[in-house]
């Protein structure tokens, strides 16, 4: 279970937890759709603010507030899965505020060079999720312990990359080649998008195994939350990749 949200400790502890019902794949799917709807509500608000405000910077408090608030709520849910039934919708709205703001910024920045970049990123994210679900259902890729360990290494490497580039940028180190539209930067983004996509297989596997094990009903919200974390990450990376492709063409 390479998704940090879906830790083995959480899985074991919830299987024996007392609850009024048991987790099902169908129930998790419904709750995932609810969270997607909540994300859209938050995103539409900050998108509206970004496009209607006299000062475009007015969207930043909402955007950064959503990002920070979403991170805090995600951490709480990760340590307290039973709270997911209450906090997952809040997380979705907060992430929506962030995604709506950042999407509006990209849309405005690439209005000429890549019109429709946000819609394309959204469609590609949805298409990727559907394809990975079909791959999982067809068992084309064996999702086992070995696969999970490989994904954990890949995820850890990406996290290290994120942190190291952030720290180096704080010290004024020039990292243009990692963030411009050059081959190296695009290659890195492609790898990260690929890892994010394969993470969905682990999310699907967790949801299926937890349902089979009779996990408590609230774990449907937890499973939907974990899936949403991956989808948000995937969308952001695809959006950034499309922006790099647009810059490369120009």
Located regions from the model:
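A hydrophobic alpha-helical transmembrane-helix feature that marks the membrane cores
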Residues: 1-250
């Amino acid at each position: 279970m390479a998704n940090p949200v879906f830790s083995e400790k959480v899985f074991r502890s919830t299987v024996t937890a007392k609850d009024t019902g048991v987790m099902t794949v169908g129930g998790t799917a419904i709750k995932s759709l609810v969270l997607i709807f909540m994300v859209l509500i938050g995103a539409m608000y900050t998108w509206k603010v970004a496009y209607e405000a006299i000062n475009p910077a007015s969207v930043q408090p909402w955007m950064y507030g959503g990002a920070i608030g979403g991170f805090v709520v995600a951490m709480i849910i990760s340590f307290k899965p039973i709270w997911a039934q209450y906090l997952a919708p809040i997380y979705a709205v907060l992430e929506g505020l962030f995604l709506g703001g950042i999407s509006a910024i990209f849309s405005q920045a690439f209005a000429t060079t890549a019109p429709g970049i946000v819609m394309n990123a959204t469609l590609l994210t949805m298409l990727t999720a559907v394809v990975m679900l079909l791959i999982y259902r067809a068992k084309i890729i064996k999702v086992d312990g070995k696969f999970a360990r490989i994904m954990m290494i890949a995820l850890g490497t990406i996290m290290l990359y994120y942190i190291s580039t952030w720290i180096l940028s704080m010290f004024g180190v020039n990292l243009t080649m990692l963030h411009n539209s050059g081959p190296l930067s695009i290659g890195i983004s492609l790898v990260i998008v690929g890892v994010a996509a394969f993470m969905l297989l682990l999310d699907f596997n967790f949801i299926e195994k937890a349902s089979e094990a009779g996990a408590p009903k609230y774990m449907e919200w937890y499973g939907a939350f974990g899936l949403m974390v991956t989808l948000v990450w995937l969308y952001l990376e695809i959006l950034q990749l499309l922006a790099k492709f647009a810059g490369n063409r120009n």
